[in-house]
Swiss-Prot record:
Other remarks on this protein: This protein may be expected to contain an N-terminal transit peptide but none has been predicted.
E.C. number(s) listed in UniProt: 3.4.21.53
Organism: Oryza sativa subsp. indica
Organism ancestry: Eukaryota, Viridiplantae, Streptophyta, Embryophyta, Tracheophyta
Any Gene Ontology biological process: protein quality control for misfolded or incompletely synthesized proteins
GO molecular function: ATP binding; ATP hydrolysis activity; ATP-dependent peptidase activity; sequence-specific DNA binding; serine-type endopeptidase activity; single-stranded DNA binding
Pfam families: AAA (PF00004), Lon_C (PF05362), Lon_lid (PF22667), LON_substr_bdg (PF02190)
Protein name: Lon protease homolog, mitochondrial
């Protein structure tokens, strides 16, 4: 019997330990235990910790008895715990073999075999209450008996659930007559509501009825008939059962875990348990299973079980044949599909194709066929599913249009299509320099990107953020970068964007749903590696539709945008090859998580020299051509451009400068038109061109084509075009002169007609050529004079100067010091003025004006305190601050001012007033000061340096911590300046009042 127990453990390895054997039965998924899977998560497993597999009465060895005793002790302990909460207290647990009278439970579907769990639902509340009471009284047993079919019904025909309802209504003898006599002693392991979980122990047989409601019967415990475990016939039969189960396993994966576990230990088994196991997991008829349960002869029981598993084998073979037939049918369908495709092609060639759905499907398949090798597998799967769905939908349904639009977007995207990048660093440098002057930091970063791509052989997407004032070229540099890299360019502005769907797309459930901007970008450019410019990222909105800044986190994260998910497409898109360039004016407005994903490149404002280059080489030239004015007709001198920059356009960028230049050339164009100048080619010029070159039109086209094909000939072509235009203008002027001299009294219409004929005759004769040359010489004296714009007449075209000279004093008086400020318009000078209001013992005070912010007011208070300490150290006998009320003012009172960088300037102004000494001439300073006199770093070094140069300042004082920022400036910015870098205010005092300094001249 030790071998029998081991075999049972092999068959039910978890049954002998605890309830996890329910998982094995669940894997079997036999009809008997289909409902049991719902209990695996909690209810059965908790009960299984104390429920034990009950041995059959035939197994009388000590180990089986010990297992039963342990189970009974566990049940007794539970009953004792439950009994404390009730009035009935039973000190011991009834053993299974002592159960001679049990409550009868009807089983409608399958019999319960010993060693298996089964959940049933008890609808009779009285019966359910009796089971609960028995369990509390430590009698957790009941008899489970299979219900017979009604007389006159075929057991092989499935009926409705009405019979089940009638069983619940039966009581007493009526119910007893419907039950099979042989059943199973079941332990009640769990009661949850009306669900009762039973564990089979041993076979029972009803002898008589004890009670009608609930039905209670007397039972006899059945034992297997004695058998010889070494009998060859029994062994052979059991081996055949195991072999059949193995074949079932090969044919079907059903019950895989259970059969493998059992057959691994085929030498250690218990024949009765093997028979019960095979019958229990089979899907046989319930009455055949009942026959196995009733059979006490082990050999006969094995034979019955063998018949059942053989039937399962036949079912598996039938399943295989069905699967094979289906596969053959699918192959036939594929053949039919190929023939249909050929038929469609023939119809298409003959013009007989009229099915819109078929045409749409063909169009989508044709699109994706070219991208099939590069398109991800999951996208192809979605497309195939949607195409199948499209064929099943009616063309008039709304879902048809949704599916069609979805397929249109899916198939049009450039899956795996990348444009060939240009990794030529010199070519990129040339393009960037052609389009933009300056911006060395941006150009250097792009060249680094190209260099890395050249070494790797491929490039990865990056996220770059260009920050700077308006008009410095942040947006336009994006196009130049795309041209230098040979990438497609796409720009979309997110300024004021408050809807997440603009980035991530709409769900397809919404009417009029559209993909997000990134998907639209890929469709527009046709490549998967464009350069995307996200403009004004610092001005993202936030509304009820979500936070777009948070939606951009996934888009602008190189680790996440490999699988960017658009709500509309709902399939991952690879954006790892996209180069993102963002622009912002104030990076402090960008959320920190988003800012962390970007590489910041700060673009400072342009200095005067840079603006001059940009105006002369780009703005003035392009504006003149856009207005149709030739270089010989108008000129804007360098002096005019310099005055325009200094007095009208002091902002950091050049956008306003471009507007002013456009304004100048518009007025020049109006002036030229009023003088009768026209640059349009005349009819006579066309006649001359045609007479000189017979194939004039073809030559022009040829010249154009050659210019497009060979960039080296572009300048020559432009020169030829300018020459032709100039000759046409001179010819037009000649015509007007001849008209005026020859036909002064004719009406305009007659004059034009006569002149046209006359001019044509003259042009066709040698005499005409001589007259034309003479007319040219005569018209040269009468030609319109060239319009020249210089600083003297600039006001006639752009109005009065907007900015006056920032420098008010050649030599600052006592109490006045020049500071340096930094605004959105760039750098500027800022005077700090201090004067004494009132004097008297103990009247020391400070008054502030000039629309100062809180930070600047606090800085003034600190300056007042530090100034008193400095004065006490330098001139102990001077009691100015103790006895004087001081008024500090910052001019331009209508302009709000704030910031700590004027601290050292305020101290110097107060000390100048206190000592009665003016500061050094041509001196400007900036720096935040602490109460201990330390000078802290400031921002905007370049802008402040430019402002100082504009005001003819010779000496500048900067904090020592800003030396690195100053060293990075261009040489032309630092040229001619005496710069001091200080750590404490005492150094500034020596520079401002004693001129004993250690300087650094740049």
């Amino acid at each position: 019997m030790l071998r029998a127990a081991a075999a049972a453990a092999a068959v039910f390895p978890s049954r002998f330990a605890a309830a996890p054997a329910v998982a094995a039965v669940e894997e079997v998924r036999s009809p008997l235990l289909r409902v049991l899977g719902a209990l695996r998560g909690g209810r059965v497993s908790t009960l299984g910790r104390r429920a034990r597999f009950c041995s059959n009465s035939a197994g009388s060895d000590s180990e089986a008895a010990a297992a039963e005793a342990k189970a009974e002790d566990a049940v007794a302990a539970e009953g004792e715990a439950d009994g404390k909460a009730s009035s009935a207290i039973v000190p011991t647990v009834l053993r299974p073999e002592d159960c001679l009278s049990v409550i009868a439970l009807p089983l409608p579907h399958r019999p319960l075999f010993p060693g298996f769990y089964m959940p049933i639902y008890v609808k009779d509340q009285k019966l359910l209450q009796a089971l609960v009471e028995n369990r509390k009284r430590s009698i957790p047993y009941a008899g489970a008996f299979l219900v017979k079919d009604e007389e006159g019904t075929d057991p092989n025909i499935v009926t409705s659930s009405d019979s089940d309802k009638s069983i619940d209504d039966l009581k007493g003898k009526e119910l007893l007559q419907r039950l099979n006599e042989v059943g199973t002693l079941a332990q009640i392991t769990s009661i949850q509501g009306d669900q009762v979980v039973l564990l089979g122990h041993r076979r029972l047989k009803i002898t008589e009825m004890v009670q009608e409601d609930p039905l209670t019967v007397k039972v006899d415990h059945l034992k297997e008939k004695p058998y010889d475990k070494d009998d060859d016939v029994i062994k052979a039969t059991s081996f055949e059962v195991i072999s059949t189960l193995r074949e079932v396993l090969k044919a079907s994966s059903l019950w895989k875990d259970h059969v493998q576990t059992y057959t691994q230990h085929m030498g250690d088994f218990n024949y009765p348990r093997l028979a019960d196991f095979g019958a229990a997991i089979s899907g046989a008829n319930k009455f055949l299973c009942q026959e196995v349960l009733e059979e006490l002869d082990v050999y006969k029981r094995l034979k019955l079980t063998l018949e059942l598993v053989k039937k399962e084998m036949e079912i598996s073979k039938l399943q295989q044949s069905i699967a094979k037939a289906i596969e053959e049918k699918i192959s036939g369908d594929q053949r039919r599909y190929l023939l249909n495709e050929q038929l469609k092609a023939i119809k298409k060639e003959l013009g007989l194709e009229t099915d819109d759905k078929t045409a749409l499907s063909a169009k989508f398949r044709e699109r994706i066929e070219a991208k099939k090798e590069k398109c991800p597998a999951h996208v192809l799967q979605v497309i195939e599913e949607e195409l199948t769905k499209l064929q099943l939908l009616e063309a008039s349904s709304s879902e048809f249009n949704v599916t069609r639009n979805y397929l249109d977007w899916l198939t049009v995207l450039p899956w795996g299509n990348y444009s060939d990048e240009n990794f030529d660093v010199h070519h990129a440098q040339q393009i960037l320099d052609e389009d933009h002057y300056g911006l060395s930091d941006v150009k250097e970063r792009i060249l680094e990107f190209i260099a890395v791509g050249k070494l790797r052989g491929t490039s990865q997407g990056k996220i770059i953020c260009l920050s700077g004032p308006p008009g410095v070229g942040k947006t336009s540099i994006g196009r130049s970068i795309a041209r230098a890299l040979n990438r497609k360019f796409y720009r979309f502005s997110v300024g004021g964007l408050a809807d997440v769907a603009e980035i991530k797309g709409h769900r397809r459930t919404y009417v009029g749903a559209m993909p997000g901007k990134m998907v639209q970008c890929l469709k527009s450019v046709g490549t998967a590696n464009p350069l995307v410019l996200i403009d004004e990222i610092d001005k993202l909105g936030r509304g009820h539709s979500g936070d777009p800044a948070s939606a951009l986190l996934e888009l602008l994260d190189p680790e996440q945008n490999v699988n960017f998910l658009d709500h509309y497409l709902d399939v991952p898109i690879d954006l790892s090859k996209v180069l993102f360039v963002c622009t912002a004016n104030v990076i402090e407005m960008i959320p920190n998580p988003l800012l962390d994903r970007m590489e910041i490149i700060a673009i400072a404002g342009y200095i005067t020299d840079e603006k001059m280059h940009i105006a002369r080489d780009y703005l003035e030239k392009n504006t003149r051509e856009a207005c149709g004015i030739k270089p010989e007709q108008a000129e804007v001198t360098d002096a005019a451009l310099l005055a325009l920059i200094e007095s009208y356009c002091r902002e950091a960028g050049v956008r306003n400068l471009q507007k002013q230049i456009e304004k100048i050339y518009r007025k020049i164009a109006l002036q030229l038109v009023r003088q009768g100048v026209s640059n349009e080619p005349t009819q006579e010029a066309a006649i001359v061109t045609a007479s000189e070159e017979p194939n004039g039109g073809d030559s022009a086209n040829k010249l154009k084509d050659e210019t497009m094909e060979d960039p080296a000939t572009e300048n020559a072509a432009m020169t030829n075009a300018d020459t032709a235009s100039k000759e046409a203008s001179e010819l037009d002027l000649l015509k007007r002169t001849v008209d005026h001299d020859v036909h002064p009294a004719e009406t305009p219409k007659e004059a034009v007609l006569t002149d046209s004929a006359l001019s044509t005759d003259k042009l066709c004769t040698p005499e005409g050529n001589k007259d034309m040359e003479g007319a040219k010489e005569e018209s040269a004296d009468k030609a319109v004079e060239k319009v020249v714009i210089d600083s003297s007449n600039l006001g006639d075209y752009v109005g009065k100067p907007v900015f006056q000279a920032e420098r008010i004093y050649e030599q600052t008086p006592v109490g006045v010091v020049m500071g340096l400020a930094w605004t959105a318009m760039g750098g500027s000078t800022l005077y700090i003025e201090t004067t004494k209001v009132e004097e008297g013992d103990g009247k020391g005070a400070l008054v502030l004006t000039g629309q100062l912010g809180d930070v600047m007011k606090e800085s003034a208070q600190i300056a007042h305190t530090v100034g008193r300490a400095i004065l006490l150290d330098k001139e102990p006998e001077n009691l100015f601050f103790a006895n004087s009320k001081v008024h500090l003012h910052v001019p331009a009172g209508s302009t709000p001012k704030d910031g700590p960088s004027a601290g050292c300037t305020m101290i110097t102004s107060m000390l100048s007033l206190a000592m009665g000494k003016p500061v050094k001439k041509d001196l400007a300073m900036t720096g935040e000061v602490t109460l201990t006199g330390r000078i802290l770093p400031i921002g905007g070094v370049k802008e402040k340096t430019i402002a100082a140069r504009r005001s003819a300042v010779k000496t500048i004082v900067f904090p020592a911590a800003n030396k690195r920022d100053f060293d990075e400036l261009a040489p032309n910015v630092k040229e001619g300046l005496e710069v001091h870098f200080v750590d404490t205010y005492n150094e500034i005092f020596d520079i401002a009042f004693q001129s004993e300094t250690q300087t650094e001249t740049s």
